[in-house]
């Protein structure tokens, strides 16, 4: 494993102050306040509070299907890249996850009903079963305590000839990611890069093997993240149009969020590439307010494997039924002709 650190436009001594400033800027509308606000905002998001939520379930179920297909399709080496990697591995039994309780509306009910030894294990749709199997490999005791993020899912399914590149700009998370990855048996195939994944991705494409899977999933704390996703993907497709690209996004009452899938669809159609769009909403209980956290999210995949739509069509009804909280729950799935 190699860990590469890129210089940040702020001094290390200022990090603690940036955490405080980041919270203030977010409340004030940081997206209008320039580069310093952007840096502070990036430092304020910690995925450890959200690990294993319904958004992770959607994203990681699709990721497992795609990775398994690509690994089996050809022996040619595959480049895997995650633009916003986080720490790679999370503990659901520790304070961050316990405080938010988001896994209780995500992976935990699925694990209890369809995980190892559960009554419904044999009836789990193939995509859901494969996803839970990856989690089980990290939780030999049968209790779901450790949750592998996208980097660890990719590491679990990659082959000896594949390479994994992980971008993480957050100073604390990048150090934790480096430490977590170092303990993997295939760590020599993985490179941790402390850099902005939107820009860092450019140096990787096109890969020498002409095969790549790229996951783009920023926190979207800033409105500018949506435009950066589109710009990043447009640049990536100009460099390597045949790669498989997964974009995750939150479904929230913000114009940029509503426009994003339409912009991605237009981008794929202009390039003549196939696409798939899936959303999952757990709805909202009668006693829950509009401030009770994220209720829905979506993924947009360019150049998806042909099996992905069918696998999600089987899995999403089961996932939605298990996780639904009330009014507004549902799922949608559409793909290119």
Where on the chain are the PLM-derived regions?
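Class I S-adenosyl-L-methionine-dependent methyltransferase catalytic core
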Residues: 35, 39-337
